Amino acid sequence: MPSFALKVTRSGLSGLGRLSPELAGKAAFRLFCLTPSRRPRGSKAKSAYMEGRQRLISAEQVMLSFPGGRATAYRLNGGAKGPRKRYLVVHGWGSSSEYMSELTVFLANTGAEVISLDLPGHGRSAGRFLNVRLAVSAIAAASARFGALDAAIGHSFGGASLALASAGFLPGIEPLQTERLVLIGAPSAMGWLFKDFGQLMGLGPATQMALEAEAGRVTGRALTAYDERRGILDPGLPVLVVHAEDDKEVSADHARAYAGGGGDVRLFWANGFGHRRIVSAAPVLEAISAFLSETVKTESSPEDGDGTVLSFYRSPVRRSS
């Protein structure tokens, strides 16, 4: 049953839509971009958050500014001397660097310089709103501040934003310079999110069209462009796509779409870890490490020939508690 707040919001948008679908679409887009509370919900989330804070307690915090906002980045091994790799880690919607900290520390323990970015409206970054342009702008600011990357690793919305950033998808923002890309549970398209949101809010056809038009106006690319399978990934960029077929938040079809889009894309199924636990699962960390260190051998997928399937992982994944 819809909550009282949702009923009121639906009613308000419906009334505004009768007066002006354009204004209702703009209001709906603002609601769509409103970020959730930063407070962890439930005992497991609180425990994971506090453990993450402890892992990052000694990390350098750097404030990044960009058109439209500011973001906070955590930097590990920033003062190390000598040549070393540099990685960027980006969390998903409603998450933060704390929840990505196991992966961040795992990478830092290899001796690499690791930057973990809190997207606008998340973690210790300013704001209450997030959209693709803000996310890609924050990523560009991190790249400008710290330099070219050996790899960028992103989860969910963060992964999708990295894919768009590396392809130079948004006008006015320079492409992200990275040698490799790791996408964990990341969507390959955006249109479905707006359709689902429109249904949740009970938007009429005219207001739905205005919502999608506003998304295009703000981000600089029409919403339909986000759903094109070709051109989202740089064909010359090695990409590791990590996904679980039991992911209930982002369908595994998105991983298949990345793999089927051409280029040097490798697909790793981490079944049993869902959408959130996947970022700290031991087999996933091992797969990422192997991919980043260039020790992975690949073979053609026996299923459909799209992309490649990593050969070092065949057995079913044991669920973690």
Predicted regions and their residues:
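N-terminal cap/lid segment of alpha/beta-hydrolase-fold proteins
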Residues: S43-A80
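Conserved alpha/beta-hydrolase
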Residues: S97, T104-A126
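Alpha/beta-hydrolase active-site loop
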Residues: F129-D150
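Gly/Ala-rich beta-loop-alpha elbow adjacent to hydrolase catalytic centers
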Residues: G154, G158-L162
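Hydrolase active-site cap/lid region
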Residues: F169-R221
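Short beta-strand/loop motif that positions the catalytic acidic residue
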Residues: D234-P235, V241-H243, D247
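Conserved alpha/beta-hydrolase "acid-adjacent" motif
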Residues: K248-H254
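Catalytic histidine-centered segment of alpha/beta-hydrolase-like enzymes
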Residues: F273-L285, S301-Y313
